[in-house]
């Protein structure tokens, strides 16, 4: 028998307790600019930390291989219904443990090993699971990669040419570091021309799509995958969506279970349901609109400070910065900004001469700081502070002065009250 007091984390494992406390402190004291990160609400975290973690529930709601699933069934059913409502679709699978798992399931459902897949090149802003040679998607399947044109937009002419030449079975429209807007209709026209399945990976923009401030990939795509954190502000997890295609939906269902997963994480699914409910509130639309405004505010200042932005700017929540002209690498800038209490990630830029472990760029985004309550004024300040550090990496005085300003800003707008 457990006692919530006697068997608390603090009493049971002081090392892990202290590590968590330090991370809580870091989140409070640092400005979070990593585009793929966000802050989950107390309600989401409460659901994820619940006793639902104890329940095994192989199968799907109403069709389990274990007894005692009547209450976790409620959680999964709510998560599915809310996801369907949020994205306007008739099928949602809430069981994928991650976005990569969701993508792997789609591959398994519609392709055979060796089939050709056309996706965005990692160096141009794509994701590992879009055909990178170091990933399963580039090892099991014949991966062909497209990139950006001279204006920093997706090179649709190249996509069409590669599709015509290689006849892919599936085309992936999506990204990990692209600040533009995807033309779903154009992708569908190209996919139809070679009879390919069109998949959208909306992991980065799912919240924007749900709020109606970024184009919805439906009805143009056969299937969409996403993570449930990032702009959706839920727990870390994955999601598969499709509409008006029961045959494909059946394949996705079996591709997850028993295809690549066993027991679902019911505590995470409950947390997803909570996040979807929050995203259905009118305030979520206001939040996503502010995400876009804040990204634009940072864009304006960074351009004024002489930092080059790939694609010329941003039309979503993220900015990919080319910092070559600063004389410092992405690795150096990431470390310097970290010392100044600004968290970013180094990122390759198109045709980057440096390795992915060093890079010539930084990727930043506005979702987390917007959740924190930052508006345009604060984002302009943050962009100026970022520029101060990036042009002076290693300058202890600049880094310390910046850290002090960041701490003051963070104290005024805490993540959790």
Curated annotation (Swiss-Prot):
The record marks 229 as: Plays an important role in substrate specificity. (6S)-5,6,7,8-tetrahydrofolate binds at residues 122, 126-128, 355-357. Pathway: One-carbon metabolism; tetrahydrofolate interconversion; Amino-acid biosynthesis; glycine biosynthesis; glycine from L-serine: step 1/1. Its cofactor is pyridoxal 5'-phosphate. One of its GO terms (molecular function) is glycine hydroxymethyltransferase activity. Its main location: cytoplasm. The modification N6-(pyridoxal phosphate)lysine is found at residue 230. Homodimer. It is an enzyme of class 2 (transferase). It comes from Francisella tularensis subsp. holarctica (strain LVS). This is Serine hydroxymethyltransferase. Its EC number is 2.1.2.1. Disulfide bonds: none annotated. It catalyses: (6R)-5,10-methylene-5,6,7,8-tetrahydrofolate + glycine + H2O = (6S)-5,6,7,8-tetrahydrofolate + L-serine.
């Amino acid at each position: 028998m457990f006692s919530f007091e006697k068997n608390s984390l603090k009493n049971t494992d002081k090392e892990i307790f202290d590590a968590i406390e330090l991370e809580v402190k870091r989140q409070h004291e640092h400005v979070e600019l990593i585009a793929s990160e966000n802050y989950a609400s107390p309600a989401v975290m409460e659901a994820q930390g619940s006793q639902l973690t104890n329940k095994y529930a192989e199968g799907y709601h109403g069709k389990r291989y274990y007894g005692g699933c009547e209450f976790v069934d409620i959680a999964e059913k709510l998560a599915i219904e809310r996801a369907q409502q949020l994205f306007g679709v008739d099928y949602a699978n809430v069981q994928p443990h991650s976005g990569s798992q969701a993508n792997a399931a789609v591959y398994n459902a519609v392709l055979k090993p060796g089939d050709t897949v056309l996706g965005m090149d990692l160096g141009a802003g794509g994701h590992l699971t879009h055909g990178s040679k170091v990933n399963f998607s580039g090892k099991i399947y014949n991966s062909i990669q497209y990139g950006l044109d001279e204006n920093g937009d997706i090179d649709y002419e190249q996509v069409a040419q590669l599709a015509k030449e290689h006849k892919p079975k599936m085309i992936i429209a999506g990204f990990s570091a692209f600040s533009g807007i995807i033309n779903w209709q154009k992708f569908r026209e190209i996919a139809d021309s070679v009879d390919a399945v069109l998949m959208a990976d909306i992991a980065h923009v799912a919240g924007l799509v749900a709020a109606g401030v970024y184009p919805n990939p439906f009805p143009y795509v056969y299937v969409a995958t996403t993570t449930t954190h990032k702009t959706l502000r839920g727990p870390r997890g994955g999601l598969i969506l499709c509409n008006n295609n029961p045959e494909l939906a059946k394949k996705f269902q079996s591709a997850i279970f028993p295809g690549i997963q066993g027991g679902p994480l019911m505590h995470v699914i409950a947390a997803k349901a909570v996040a979807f409910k929050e995203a259905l509130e009118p305030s979520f639309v206001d939040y996503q609109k502010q995400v876009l405004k804040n990204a634009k505010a940072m864009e304006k200042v960074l351009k004024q400070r002489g930092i080059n932005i790939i694609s010329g700017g941003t039309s979503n929540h993220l900015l990919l910065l080319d910092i070559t002209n600063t004389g410092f690498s992405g690795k150096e800038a990431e470390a310097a900004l970290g010392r100044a209490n600004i968290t970013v990630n180094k990122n390759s830029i198109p045709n980057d001469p440096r390795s992915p472990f060093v890079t010539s760029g930084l990727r930043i985004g506005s979702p987390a700081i917007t959740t924190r309550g930052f508006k345009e004024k604060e984002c302009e300040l943050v962009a100026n502070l970022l520029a101060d550090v990036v042009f002076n990496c290693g300058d202890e005085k600049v880094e310390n002065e910046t850290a002090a300003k960041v701490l003051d800003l963070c104290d005024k707008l805490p993540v959790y009250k």
